[in-house]
């Protein structure tokens, strides 16, 4: 299907997200910027409205708040929480890549780490709410894979 058809179906299926996109576009046209819950701002000083009603940079206007909030705010917050949960174990957080947290799991602690990740999953929304004072009305869950390397992983959460 064409891009226009795809977007039309998207906005019909996800009306709340479409309304939020419209709100972001209005914010950019009124203020020239978007402010996300963490306080980070994205400036769009050259944004203009086309005769069709759409605005320039609309893809960035829709994408920056989501990608930024996820990778620059939520992931580090949860990374610190998971690191704290693992603090008494031999297993440890060794890296983060985009929206992934990499944990080196000691062989004897696999079940314990899995339990702690389930716990972190249960705490996720309340941690975000406490830090940023927002309530998510969309699912936000951790996913976990385990393996000896990135190529040989299996889903565990």
Spell out what each predicted region is:
Residues 1-157:
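Conserved catalytic core of nucleotide polymerization and phosphodiester-bond processing enzymes
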